[in-house]
From Swiss-Prot:
Binding partners and assembly: Oligomerizes as a right-handed, spiral filament on DNA at oriC.
Protein name in the entry: Chromosomal replication initiator protein DnaA
Taxonomic placement: Bacteria, Pseudomonadati, Pseudomonadota, Gammaproteobacteria, Alteromonadales
Sites where the protein binds ATP: G165, G167, K168, T169
GO CC terms in record: cytoplasm; plasma membrane
Gene: dnaA
Keywords from the UniProt entry: ATP-binding, Cytoplasm, DNA replication, DNA-binding, Lipid-binding, Nucleotide-binding
GO molecular function terms noted in the UniProt entry: ATP binding; ATP hydrolysis activity; DNA replication origin binding; lipid binding
Length: 457
């Protein structure tokens, strides 16, 4: 009875939550009765903790409404419900390996063993263990972990999007390494979208398009980076459309990345953009301050360097756009320290990164943020300083305040002064409000990410 009601509960939650929230947290859950207790099985600890913290009240309320005092107790566990665990499969017949392309060569000229070449592009150094997690990327990592544990399951396809250098490629390789660890014979392919195009062109030139199709449709998991480069390549899109359909029909995992939300990719057919959103779409945002510091400390530790906390915070507060920029800056600091033999101090970092820091301070000012946000929301610059409280003005103003806190080194009182002499508590409220809305509203989350990209580019 309670298990059948669970399906109704899922229906209510689907109506109440956004598509992304439902796909991320509710769809993977499995339910089973044990006595008077309804056990909800989550695929991993992250999903379990999130559901228990965010949705348990809604779930309990539903069962109380339906069953009153007879509502079951709830318990959470990790894994699959016992009755859903399959028996060990009989050994499968070994299929002949499809021809495998070798990097840099003609598609048909280099047939190779399936396992070795299918996973030849997975970088073993990119693991979940060395991926620094923060609020900006925790949903992406959680989804990637679930895919690694259960490829072809709830999150298929998985679409990760965000600016350059934020860790999307790291997650792709981490998933590939996770799948191969669990199943060493898995045929996993990672590639940039341009490589797919090149392989198809070579196949056409060599009259080998059927072999091309067999190869890409025989994989267990296909990961394609920077899918936006398919734009205006009609034949490649046509071939990928059919490859996509074939893999999904076979419950084979697909992960795609892009620098923008699927519907915002110009030059890509609507039928493809629609399919990109069939599974789960997750934004990877620029790392917040604490994550930037953690990235620097992890990188320094891996390099055998003792990086003082105050130096890590100094760099992280001034370089905000992406992980790649942070790591590049730290590499420059380490190289300068090795060449000169000087200790790594804040003054030393100022000298070593003089050009980077000057450029960043020149690009990102409160005035620049106000102008960019006003243009983005199509309001007047004067509205940023006005006392108007209508949502169409107040929300962009709050967004600009939050971005000023994130992207400049100005204090809350200084930010308030720049917004028409407002009190620092008003700025603090704006920052907290935008942080809350980024979790609740897909549109606000998108706006924030777009503005960060614009201001940091």
């Amino acid at each position: 009875m309670a298990v059948s009601l669970w399906q109704q509960c899922i229906g209510r939650l689907q109506d109440e939550l956004s598509a992304q929230q439902f796909s991320m947290w509710i769809r993977p859950l499995q339910a089973e009765m044990e006595g008077d207790t309804l056990v909800l099985y989550a695929p991993n600890r992250f999903v379990l903790d999130w559901v228990r913290d965010k949705y348990i009240n809604s779930i309990n309320q539903f069962f109380t409404e339906q069953l009153g005092d007879n509502a079951p107790k709830l318990r959470f566990d990790i894994g699959s419900r016992p009755s859903a665990k399959p028996q060990a499969p009989a050994p499968a017949a070994v299929k002949a390996a499809a021809p495998q392309p070798k990097p840099g060569n003609s598609f048909v000229s280099q047939p190779e063993p399936a396992v070795s070449n299918h996973r030849s592009n997975i970088n073993p150094t990119y693991q979940f263990d060395n991926f620094v997690e923060g609020k900006s990327n925790q949903l992406g990592k959680a989804a990637a972990l679930q895919v690694a544990e259960n490829p072809g399951g709830a999150y298929n396809p998985l679409f990760l999007y965000g600016g350059t250098g934020l860790g999307k490629t790291h997650l792709l390789h981490a998933v590939g390494n996770g799948i191969i660890k669990n199943n060493p014979n898995a045929k996993v392919v990672y590639m940039h979208s341009e490589r797919f195009v090149q392989d198809m062109v070579k196949a056409l030139q060599n009259n080998a398009i059927e072999e091309f199709k067999r190869y890409y449709r025989s994989v267990d998991a296909l990961f394609i980076d920077d899918i936006q480069f398919f734009a205006n390549k009609d034949r490649s899109q046509e071939e990928f459309f059919h490859t996509f359909n074939a893999l999904l029909e076979g419950n084979h995992q697909i992960i795609l990345t892009s620098d923008r939300y699927p519907k915002e990719i110009d030059g890509v057919e609507d039928r493809l953009k629609s399919r990109f959103g069939w599974g789960l779409t997750v934004a990877i945002e620029p790392p917040e301050l604490e994550t930037r510091v953690a990235i620097l400390m992890r990188k320094a530790q891996e390099s055998g360097i003792n990086l003082p906390d105050e130096v890590a915070f100094f760099i992280a507060k001034r370089l905000r756009s992406n992980v790649r920029e942070l790591e590049g800056a730290l590499n420059r600091v380490i190289a300068n320290a090795n060449f000169t033999g000087r200790p790594i101090t804040i003054d030393f970092v100022r000298e070593a990164l003089r050009d980077l820091l000057a450029l960043q301070e020149k690009l990102v000012t409160i005035d620049n943020i106000q102008k960019t946000v006003a243009e983005y929301y199509k309001i007047k610059m004067a509205d940023m300083l006005s006392k108007r409280r209508s949502r169409s003005v107040a929300r962009p103003r709050q967004m600009a305040m939050a971005l000023s806190k994130e992207l400049t080194n100005q204090s809350l009182p200084e930010i308030g002064d720049a917004f028409g002499g407002r009190d620092h508590t008003t700025v603090l409220h704006a920052c907290r409000k935008i942080a809350q809305l980024r979790e609740e509203s897909h549109d606000i989350k998108e706006d924030y990410a777009n503005l960060i990209r614009t201001l940091s580019s």
